[in-house]
Amino acid sequence: MVLIRVLANLLILQLSYAQKSSELVVGGDECNINEHRSLVLVYSDGIQCGGTLINQEWMLTAAHCDGKKMKLQFGLHSKKVPNKDKQTRVPKEKFFCLSSKNNKEWDKDIMLIRLNRPVNNSKHIAPLSLPSKPPSQDTVCNIMGWGTISPTEETYPDVPHCANINILDHAVCRAIYPGLLEKSRVLCAGILEGGKDTCGGDSGGPLICNGEIQGLLSVGGDPCAQPHVPALYIKVFDYTEWIQSIITGNTAATCPP
């Protein structure tokens, strides 16, 4: 079963992306407290997601993480004992691809958020660069988030977990996800042997390759971390022109077809 990996209090909110749920990092370890400065914890109408700061006033997450009441936390590591430089913001503006709100296309699950006021760079807060080129097959990339660390139980950690996974051939995911087009603007990533994966509560979180934000978690298997069931990540490189156009003031910019 394919699930969008989102945590809604103590239950998984199932959305219309072929009934996917949000996810957390399974098979990883606690992230180094100083090595996830761009990671954002997103609370949206009771749902937990991840996100990525791309400059002091803008961030990215998945479109299916949208909600009427959103709280965005920066510089967070432990939820119970927050860093002194933790900052909280809310959205000022939100931008979507035209079709993403209809939940009909695999590759339009992206939301660009302008913060109500800029965050200040600090020891635990800094933006991540947009990609200069797409990642090649077999590139080792990093996933991270506060999602569940068990593929079968709701075991949510106090701190974010990180793991390394690989960029896989697009054909691997096409064989798993019905309706995924050959030219969909997504990345297929995971560990074919299983054991490491994003999972419930990680939706919208980053796929980081060579120090750049290459993907946003959108869709994965249920249960998480199964052999031969990688996840789908929105291919950020294909949206860089749209993102940069909006940030520079062209709010009427359209997403790539």
Curated annotation (Swiss-Prot):
SMART domains: Tryp_SPc. It is an enzyme of class 3 (hydrolase). The keyword Disulfide bond applies. CDD domains: Tryp_SPc. The active site is at H64, D109, S203. GO terms for molecular function: serine-type endopeptidase activity; toxin activity. Monomer. Belongs to the peptidase S1 family. Snake venom subfamily. This is Snake venom serine proteinase 11. It comes from Crotalus adamanteus (Eastern diamondback rattlesnake).
